[in-house]
Each structure stands twice: as C-alpha cells, then as structure tokens.
Amino acid sequence: MRVLHFYKTYLSETVGGIEQVIFQLCESSGSWGIDNHVLTLSSDPHPPVVPFGGHVVHRARLDLQLASTGFSLSVFKQFRELAAEADVVNYHFPWPFMDLVHFLTGMNKPSVVTYHSDIIRQRVLLKLYRPLMSRFLHSVDRIVAASPNYFSTSDVLRQYREKTRVITYGLDKDGYPKPATQRLEHWREKLGPRFFLFVGVMRYYKGLHILLDALQGTDYPVVIVGAGPLQAELYAQAAALGLRNVHFLGRVDDEDKVALLQLSYAMVFPSHLRSEAFGISLLEGAMYGKPMISSEIGTGTSYINIHGETGLVVPPSQPAAFRQAMRWLWEHPQQAEEMGRNAEARYRQLFTAEEMGRRWSELYRELLEEKASSRYVKAAR
C-alpha cells in the first residue's frame, strides 16, 4: 500500500517537531508494509526525488513564503501525479495552501489529516482562512489528533468528533545514536553531575522567558539546547537577571543531544501556549527516563507528563510555580528518580514508534476497505 504525505517542509532542509513526526510515522509504518512518499516544498528542489531512510521524498520548488505558509506553482502537477499513484493521501495540518491543492487538483483518494495543531497566532488570517479550513476538514475521511487532551480541548476538533481518532506520536529509541564515553565525559566535566535540561527551538510559545524568570535568585544549573528567533532576547534576559548557572549551548548534533539527555537530572518544558501541541523533546526526556516539569495548557504535554507520577505539572506563565517545582525535584532525588522510571515505563507503554506505525497502518487499511465497500455498494445499485 502506498501513502502520500503532504506538508510544507521536511527533513533535512528544516528540522522541527512536525518534520520529525512525519519521519517517525513513515519509518515505523514502513515496517507494517506501507510504502511512504513525502511531497514537500524546497527552496532548492534538486534533485527532485530523494531516498530518505526507508521512504522517498519528492520536492517541489518553493515560490513564495507568506505568514509561515509556503506557496508553489509546480506542486499542483506533482501532487496530482503522486496522488494518482497513492492508495491513501495523508495531509499534515495546518498549511492553508495544502487545502487549495486538495480542491484544485480534484483529489479523490481516501484521505486523512494528521492534525498537528490549532492555528493560534495568526488570528486575523484565521478569520479569512476559516471557510476554506472548514470545507477541507469536512471533505477528508479521517482526522487524527495526537493526544486525547488535545482532542478534548480543541474547538476545531469538537466539530468533527465522529471522524476524529487519537493516535499518539511515537519515537524509536533504537534510532537514536549511542554517545561515546568521551562525549559523555566531556559534558559531565563541563556541566557537573546534576542539571535541568531544556531542548527545543527558541520560539514564542516555548516559554523560555518564564523559565529564566523562575531562575532569578536561584543557582540551579540549567542547560538550554537550541537556537531560534528569540535567541538574542533570551541571552539579554539571562544577563539582566544575573543568571550565572544557565548554559546556552545552541544547536548540538544528535549524539551530543543524547549525551545531555542521559546525563540530565530532569527535563524542564515551560511552554505556555497551545501552539505547543505535543512536545517531542518532552517525550524524548521520558524515553530516557527523566522526571519532567511542564505547564498545563490542555495539550499533549500533559498526556506525556502526568502530575505526581512522571513529574510535575504547573499552571502556565507562572515563574514562581515553576521555580517551586524545580526546587521540589532538586530536593527530592529519590522521588525524582522514581518519576523518571515511571516516565520511561509510560513511554514504552504508549509512545513507541512501533505502536504508532501499527495503529497508522491499521487506519490506512481501514480507509481502503471503506473505499472498496462504498464502490461495491454503488456498483450494486
């Protein structure tokens, strides 16, 4: 069975949570007999077809980028051709231009939307886009949310309860590198035996300014991995607050990231807005058996991190509450270790890539069977 995935960006040209989810979905469902192809936009689409892991990436030229939305003229032809060869089309939402491609190409294959996030920030544009969005979501056969938390709190998904399913994101730990002893010793010597860790892009919804405010007047060692548009602003904030034990490492490679995950004491994840729909790096912390601190924003973060079991969940945008949670974990190492074990057990139970691949392959086959059944009914009339 061939599945066509469609999203505006993809690895390795851009690295983000959605791209990583698509990769894990393609690789994990591939072991269940799914032939995955990804169509995406690229500023340099040469070569246009690239084998990537166990799947294939097709690239169309990016002609225009406006309000985080990529546009392309050539993608209409490529999508029409690739969709004709596919058994199922898997759209990755949100991307308004994708909706146009869906309708203007007359796509009539079984279709599913992976609903990664509500549209949060572009509220003015959302008013213009809403009629098209509603028509698009109404037209597809299934919608998939990544957590029951997000499904129950999304005003959009509430309108499509009958066709919406929940399949959580999953990670393959075996696919992560195993850091060399020298690499581990390097970071242990540089950072010390215990530190809190944040991993992620420095975006507006990540709440890093809240984390820095929470550290004022404390000396907890905190390691921040990642870069992004707020980098200079956060550096300035840390300096203004006189924070001497915050280590900004910028981007690191995967081996260094795993080394830091293994060595860390606990994960801090201060995202305070619903734009943080799941939290892949939070799940990575659980995968490596770390207790977590996150905020209650009604999304998948509180499906990964269960308060009092795998870590602590605090109200969003409250530095004092975040500071108190950090203090509690720091002063209760035995309980923190137990929470870390619980976090890893929860990952193994719910969030493995194998489980994600199995459930998605079942959904794809269900869609094909429904299509075949509807054709049979029509032919019998």
UniProtKB/Swiss-Prot annotation:
Write out the entry's keywords from A to Z.
Antibiotic resistance, Cytoplasm, Glycosyltransferase, Lipopolysaccharide biosynthesis, Transferase
Q: What is its main location?
A: cytoplasm
Q: What is the effect of changing residue 256 to A?
A: 15% catalytic activity of the wild-type using GDP-D-Rha as a donor and GlcNAc-alpha-PO(3)-PO(3)-phenylundecyl (GlcNAc-PP-PhU) or GalNAc-PP-PhU as acceptor substrate
How changing residue 26 to A affects the protein?
Answer: No effect on enzyme activity. Rescues the common polysaccharide antigen (CPA) biosynthesis to the wild-type level in cells having knockout of this gene
- What happens when the protein's gene is inactivated? Lack of common polysaccharide antigen (CPA) biosynthesis. Biosynthesis of O-specific antigen (OSA), also called B band, is unaffected. Increased susceptibility to the antibiotic colistin.
Q: What is the name of the protein in this document? A: D-rhamnosyltransferase WbpZ
Q: Where in the cell is it found?
A: Cytoplasm
Protein source organism: Pseudomonas aeruginosa (strain ATCC 15692 / DSM 22644 / CIP 104116 / JCM 14847 / LMG 12228 / 1C / PRS 101 / PAO1)
Q: Which reaction does it catalyse?
A: GDP-alpha-D-rhamnose + N-acetyl-alpha-D-glucosaminyl-di-trans,octa-cis-undecaprenyl diphosphate = alpha-D-rhamnosyl-(1->3)-N-acetyl-alpha-D-glucosaminyl-1-diphospho-di-trans,octa-cis-undecaprenol + GDP + H(+); GDP-alpha-D-rhamnose + N-acetyl-alpha-D-galactosaminyl-di-trans,octa-cis-undecaprenyl diphosphate = alpha-D-rhamnosyl-(1->3)-N-acetyl-alpha-D-galactosaminyl-1-diphospho-di-trans,octa-cis-undecaprenol + GDP + H(+); N-acetyl-alpha-D-glucosaminyl-di-trans,octa-cis-undecaprenyl diphosphate + GDP-alpha-D-mannose = alpha-D-mannosyl-(1->3)-N-acetyl-alpha-D-glucosaminyl-di-trans,octa-cis-undecaprenyl diphosphate + GDP + H(+); N-acetyl-alpha-D-galactosaminyl-di-trans,octa-cis-undecaprenyl diphosphate + GDP-alpha-D-mannose = alpha-D-mannosyl-(1->3)-N-acetyl-alpha-D-galctosaminyl-1-diphospho-di-trans,octa-cis-undecaprenol + GDP + H(+)
Please give a single GO biological process term from the UniProt record: cellular response to antibiotic
User: What turns on this gene?
Assistant: Expression is up-regulated in colistin-resistant clinical isolates (GKK-1 and GKK-3) compared to colistin-susceptible clinical isolate (GKK-2).
What the record says about activity regulation is:
Not activated by dithiothreitol (DTT) using GlcNAc-alpha-PO(3)-PO(3)-phenylundecyl (GlcNAc-PP-PhU) as acceptor substrate. 0.25% Triton X-100 and 0.125% NP-40 increases the activity 2.5-fold and 2-fold, respectively. 0.125% octyl glucoside has little effect on activity. Slightly increased activity with Mg(2+) and Pb(2+), while no effect with Mn(2+), Co(2+), Ni(2+), Cu(2+), Zn(2+), Ca(2+) or EDTA. Not inhibited by N-butyryl-galactosamine-alpha-benzyl or N-butyryl-glucosamine-beta-benzyl.
Q: List ligand-binding residues for substrate.
A: 19, 116, 206, 252
Similarity comment? Belongs to the glycosyltransferase group 1 family. Glycosyltransferase 4 subfamily.
Looking up CDD domains in the UniProt record yields: GT4_WfcD-like (cd03795)
**Enzyme type, top EC level:** transferase
Upper lineage: Bacteria, Pseudomonadati, Pseudomonadota, Gammaproteobacteria, Pseudomonadales
An example molecular function term from Gene Ontology annotations: hexosyltransferase activity
